[in-house]
Design a protein with these regions (language model features):
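A structured, charge-rich N-terminal accessory region that forms the first stable segment of a protein
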Residues: 1-67
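A short alpha->loop->secondary-structure connector
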Residues: 25-26, 102-115
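Long, hydrophobic/aromatic-enriched structural stretches that serve as scaffold segments
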Residues: 58-102
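A conserved mid-domain beta-alpha-beta active-site/ligand-binding segment of alpha/beta enzyme cores
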Residues: 131-214
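Short acidic, hydrophobic short linear motifs in intrinsically disordered regions
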Residues: 211-226, 233
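Short amphipathic alpha-helical interaction segments
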Residues: 230-246
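A short, conserved structural fragment
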Residues: 245-255
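Short, cationic-aromatic polyanion-contact patches
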Residues: 255-266
Length: 266
């Protein structure tokens, strides 16, 4: 049977590819490279412009995000037009759950082809020579496919199962609702997606900062360990540091464009 595995992020795709090789399989793995938990998504399925603008701002970079996002849009079209069985791998995190819902939306007219492999927090405790034990200590019990080692993913390969037509319809509807809300960010609470703002993230960073100079890396790193009901990435954490500097809420020793190497204080 022709199988295509879909997951969120390059790290997850690399681990999954290695897992398939360990299992003696050569199935195709596709990485979707967009953290859908953050930034505008209202027209993400029609135009890459708003998302590209957002990511250029976050990364403070002239990278051609528009081309990358256009390629992702074309990928969804090819998935929908193909005839392979599609397996979406997802953990319990906002970005992974949004990825699942987006794929369900695009494959809603061919529901017989859509499958899933679920990864729970307890799966992080599965003994494996390449396991990452630090991931199993998160107080929020959040998971993303990229947290799991190849050997742990091998153990989950048999769990891939079809998604019911009714659930696919519900997932597709939830994706449309998330797009329509177009919040600053999206959180996963009790397996439900809810809209959020940057207020609590910014306040957490201000609480971490003190009146003494502190490396921005430390502030961002500590913020990334806190519970926001979505996984805060390093790029987004440094972006929020720059935004707080621009708003005059944090002082900087260094330059905002080189925030990774700067020091910050209140």
């Amino acid at each position: 049977m022709n199988l295509i595995h879909v997951t969120n992020g390059d790290s997850a795709a690399r681990s999954l590819t290695e897992a398939l090789l360990l299992a003696g399989r050569d199935d195709q793995v596709i990485a979707l490279r967009d953290d859908l938990a953050v930034g505008p998504i209202r027209d993400v399925d029609e135009s890459p412009v708003a998302r590209a603008t957002f990511w250029r701002h976050v990364w403070n970079s002239a990278v051609d995000f528009e081309a990358e996002l256009k390629a992702q849009q074309a990928l969804f079209g090819r998935l929908a037009r193909g005839d392979a069985q599609v397996v979406v791998w997802h953990g319990q995190s906002a970005a992974d759950q949004l990825t699942l819902r987006r794929v369900a939306y695009h494959l809603r007219n061919v529901p017989q082809r859509l499958n899933e492999a679920k990864l729970a927090f307890d799966d992080l405790s599965v003994a494996a020579p390449d396991a990452h034990p630090e991931e199993a200590s998160r107080p929020d019990r959040a998971t993303a496919v990229g947290m799991f080692s190849p050997h742990q993913l091998v153990a989950k390969l048999p769990s891939a199962a079809p998604i019911s037509v009714l659930r696919i319809s519900r997932l597709a509807l939830e994706w449309q609702e998330a797009k329509h809300s177009n919040a600053e960010n999206r959180r996963l609470r009790d397996n439900m997606l809810v809209s959020g703002t940057w207020t609590d993230v910014d306040e957490a960073m201000l609480d971490i900062a003190t009146s003494e100079w502190c490396p921005a890396r430390r502030i961002a790193g500590e913020a990334m360990t806190q519970q926001f009901d979505f996984l805060l990435s390093d790029s987004v954490a440094f972006w929020r540091c720059r935004e707080l500097v621009a708003a005059g809420r944090l002082k900087i020793r260094g330059t905002p464009s080189e925030i990774v190497d700067a020091e910050l204080r209140r």
